Structures are given as structure tokens and as C-alpha cells.
Design a protein with these regions (language model features):
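P-loop NTP-binding module
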Residues: 1-248
Length: 248
């Protein structure tokens, strides 16, 4: 298997570690049949790739085998933001788009990362017709292969509210986790995304809140409108534990 280094991966602080440990634990309650998990958002810049990458790392550090697929064929920033370095010191390599276009075989796009227990399929190069590639049956075959190699397959997808790609990706997944920027997405937008994903037959596992203002977190009515979707509301769990500890 080819090697891949992740050269820009900031360490999480205490709150971040607690959040992702909680999320990782909660995934185990989703059921043994939930292995292929799409991570998406309503808008761009809501932290879906941050969520995907850190969930991959946290699971791997806990001894859980995990594969990450960068399926944002339109606007992926993973290669640059995380400093992916391929064999030979190159900053670009064969990836998902190359495989789906029939340019290389499946084994050419699966990389062992420098994180033990974590493998990765990078995005590859930009393509003019990503939707056509994602509807290719080879995409589902790739996810099935990765699911046979790992305990979880995390699929970083484009935002649901912007393009139709995520709906196609969801068809090949067992569940969806939605990254939501706190105080930045309306309830109706989230409901629209929820409906669009559910129409594909892919269950929604929950939401993960980003950019949370802890000081005002517990009292905001705005948050309460999301609470029934927040099965994996890992920031909520972290805040609740520490808030209660401070009162003792």
C-alpha cells in the first residue's frame, strides 16, 4: 500500500479531545451495520472536513481501524489544509477522481497514512463533472472494499445545501452526520437538509455543532431547536459535564 503523510494536523486541546472521544464512543451505539458514514453540512466552511479528519484520528488512536474518503470533488481543501504529502515528497497524488474516471485501479488510490490504523483515499484532481463520477457504480464498490478493510469508513462530502453530490454519496452510505456551525444555520435550512438526505434512504445519525459559544450555550432557544437532532451533539455533552462540575 502506498504511504501518505499528514504534515499539518494541529493537536486538539482538552475540550477538543473530549468532544471527539465522546463522538467516537457514540458511533458505537449506532449499530454494527453502520460502517460507512457520510459527513456533510448545510453550507461551506462549517467544519465538515475538520470533523472528518479529527474523527479519523481519534478513532485510529483508540485502536479502531478507519478509512477516510475525500469525496468533495468540487472544492476539497484537505490536501492543502492538512499538508498531505505523498510518496516522493509530492503534494499531489492519485485519488478518488482518478479511480472513478477509470485512470487507475482501486489499489492505486488507497494510502496508508502516518497515523496507525488510518488509511485514506484523497480527492485526486479537480474534475468538470463530479456528479457523473459519483453516480458510477465503482464509487459504491470502493466504499464496500474499504468497509472490508476497516471498522469505519468516513466519507467527507460536499455540503448538501449547495450541490446534489452529497445526496448521491448518501445512497452508498449507512448513515450521515451533519456538521453545523452554531448560530449560523437556520432551523429551516437544517430541516431541508434533513429531508433531502432522508429521501436517499440514508439515516441521519445526528449533528455535530461547531463554533459553540459555551458561555451562552445552555440558555439559547436557538440551540434548543436543534437539540432533537443532536444525537452526537458532542459539544453539548462536553459542556454539560464541565458545567455541572463547576457548580459542585
Amino acid at each position: 500500500m502506498k504511504q501518505l503523510k499528514i504534515t499539518k494536523f494541529p493537536a486538539l486541546d482538552y475540550a477538543g479531545n473530549e468532544a471527539f472521544n465522546t463522538l467516537s464512543t457514540n458511533l458505537s451505539f449506532a449499530g454494527a451495520n453502520v460502517k460507512k458514514i457520510m459527513i456533510t453540512s448545510c453550507h461551506a466552511s462549517e467544519g465538515k472536513s475538520y470533523l472528518s479528519m479529527n474523527l479519523m484520528r481519534t478513532l485510529a488512536q483508540r485502536g479502531i481501524k478507519v478509512a477516510l474518503v475525500d469525496a468533495d470533488l468540487r472544492r476539497s481543501l484537505v490536501n492543502s489544509d492538512y499538508g498531505l504529502q505523498f510518496e516522493g515528497g509530492r503534494n499531489d497524488g492519485k485519488g478518488l477522481s482518478h479511480f472513478l474516471a477509470g485512470m487507475v485501479g482501486m489499489d492505486e488510490v488507497i494510502y496508508q497514512t502516518d497515523i496507525p490504523n488510518a488509511i485514506m483515499v484523497p480527492v485526486g484532481r479537480d474534475v468538470p463533472n463530479p456528479l457523473a463520477l459519483l453516480t458510477n457504480h465503482h464509487f459504491a464498490e470502493l466504499l464496500d472494499m474499504l468497509a472490508s478493510m476497516a471498522d469505519y469508513v468516513i466519507v467527507d462530502s460536499p455540503p448538501v445545501g449547495m450541490v446534489i453530490d452529497a445526496a448521491e454519496i448518501a445512497k452508498a452510505c449507512d448513515g450521515t452526520l451533519i456538521a453545523v456551525n452554531y448560530n449560523d444555520v437556520s432551523r429551516q435550512e437544517l430541516l431541508d437538509v434533513k429531508q433531502q438526505i432522508e429521501q436517499t434512504g440514508c439515516p441521519i445519525l445526528g449533528t455535530a455543532l461547531n463554533q459553540v459559544d459555551y458561555d451562552n450555550y445552555m440558555g439559547r432557544k436557538y440551540y434548543k431547536s436543534y437539540s432533537k437532532y443532536g444525537k452526537y451533539g458532542y459539544y453539548r455533552e462536553y459542556y454539560k459535564r464541565n458545567h455541572e462540575a463547576e457548580k459542585k
